[in-house]
Design a protein with these regions (language model features):
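Conserved glycine-rich SAM-binding loop
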Residues: 249
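The feature marks non-catalytic terminal segments
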Residues: 46, 64, 115, 122-203
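Class I SAM-dependent methyltransferase Rossmann-like catalytic core
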Residues: 207-223
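Class I SAM-dependent methyltransferase SAM/SAH-binding core
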Residues: 252, 260-284
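Conserved SAM-binding strand-loop segment of SAM-dependent methyltransferases
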Residues: 283-294
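Active-site beta-strand->loop->alpha-helix modules in alpha/beta enzyme cores, enriched
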Residues: 1-120
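Conserved alpha-helix/loop element of class I SAM-dependent methyltransferases that forms part
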Residues: 220-238
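Conserved beta-strand signature within the Rossmann-like core of class I S-adenosyl-L-methionine
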Residues: 327-338
Length: 392
């Protein structure tokens, strides 16, 4: 059966998959290019430069906004079942490549949520790609030769030179995106789903996997959530009235608060997360679709406190807090975001005073996705904001 390399852009073969062409020098290799929705066969027996040259007409140095193919489109381009398949990492920091790698995994083995599919789903081999925030453990790492490096350089300079000065960040060819060691790892469809959800943390696709941040599995996250619940209890009691948890995700903090006797109005705009939150909600929990903007605009949900825990990463207008119907707002964020966004705003306003600052969880390194990768968890610090004139 034919070996297949499935990439979003034609130049990606030269950037990340030259060692695959070397390993299949005596076999035809099918290359599927998602952006062009086309394929080309690189015949056996040709030199690396000759093979790469066949991809030249498919290089499109333009923008990065074309609609991505869906899994059925990719499956049609693959034709009969491939023997081996290589593609992008679903955890690539270049989000369109990550999404395309995820799409390929779904095209090869349609995702099934049943536990039985997890250990035996068909696999694809992914290039580690580009991600400064997540280290994926490679199954193989292959150094290219000087001649292969020259072939890469020549192809990019002649066929994709515009990408060396692209203003589109994901298309820009930088030195680190032309690796001398090509690294690959193998994933099942279920693992691809989890990696893609993790890297999509600021978008709606974060909900494609259950518990993408592993709140229910991570020792770090459990300690952080326990500390956050205890911190909340120090500032308001269940007898003070309901509390509003903004951006409750799937309800790990919600569950802890409900267990302490609080009436929690848990809001979650993401449809997927909200469905899981509602399914698992305990007595005393009301699940709502409101965003921070909705809550501020409507001003209807009077509460003892509003909890904004690890959710101010979406460039929300912080003046919205002024319109929340409460005298107490508890914010938890990593230190960098507090320093860059929250503290400058606090210094310029007079509606709120800082009643407490506290470390809820220190930074740590932690494995994710069952040891497939690891990353730095950035820690969490809490700020209690009390409306001017409020006293305990």
């Amino acid at each position: 059966m034919t070996a297949v390399i499935v990439v979003l852009h034609a130049e990606d073969v030269a950037l990340e998959f030259v060692s695959v062409l070397r390993d299949h020098a005596d076999q035809d290799v099918l290359v599927v290019v998602g952006q062009a929705r086309a394929s080309v066969t690189l015949p056996a027996g040709l030199s690396l430069r000759e093979r790469l040259e066949l991809l030249g007409p498919m290089v499109e140095p333009g923008g990065n906004t074309a609609e991505l193919p869906v899994p059925s489109d990719v499956a049609a381009l693959l034709g009969e079942a491939p023997g081996e398949i290589w593609t992008h990492s679903p955890a690539d920091h270049r989000i369109r490549r990550a999404r395309f790698g995820w799409i390929v995994s779904r095209a090869v083995a349609p995702f099934s949520p049943s536990p039985a599919s997890s250990p035996s789903s068909p696999t694809v081999t992914c290039s580690v790609g580009d991600n400064p925030f997540l280290q994926t453990i490679p199954g193989t790492a292959t150094a290219i030769t000087a001649a292969e490096a020259e072939a890469k350089i020549d192809f990019i300079n002649r066929r994709a030179g515009e990408l060396l000065r692209s203003r589109v960040a994901d298309r820009l060819v930088t030195t680190d995106r032309v690796p001398a060691v090509e690294r690959f790892f193998t994933v099942s469809a279920v693992q691809a789903n989890r990696l893609y959800a993790l890297i999509s943390s600021l978008g709606d696709d974060a909900a494609v996997a259950d518990d993408p941040w592993e709140f229910g599995r991570s020792a770090y996250e459990a300690a952080r959530l326990d500390a956050t619940a205890a911190w909340t209890a120090r500032w308001c009691s269940p007898q003070d009235g309901p509390i509003v948890e903004v951006g409750a995700c799937q309800g790990e903090l919600t569950r802890r608060l409900a267990g302490k006797g609080y009436r929690v109005q848990a809001t979650e705009p993401n449809v997927g997360f909200r469905a899981r939150l509602a399914e698992r909600a305990e007595p005393g929990v009301e699940v709502l679709p409101d965003s921070l903007e909705d809550l501020a605009d409507h001003g209807e949900r009077q509460a003892a406190a509003y909890l904004l825990v690890e959710m101010l990463y979406y460039d929300q207008d912080l003046t919205l807090l002024d319109r929340l119907p409460t005298d107490l707002v508890l914010i938890a964020l990593e230190t960098g975001q507090l320093n860059e966004r929250v503290w400058p705003w606090l210094r310029e306003q007079s509606t709120w005073r800082v009643a407490e600052r506290v470390e809820l969880a220190p930074p740590t390194l932690e494995s994710v996705c069952d040891g497939l990768a690891y990353l730095r968890k950035r820690g969490s610090r809490g700020l209690v904001l009390a409306r001017a004139g409020w006293r305990r």
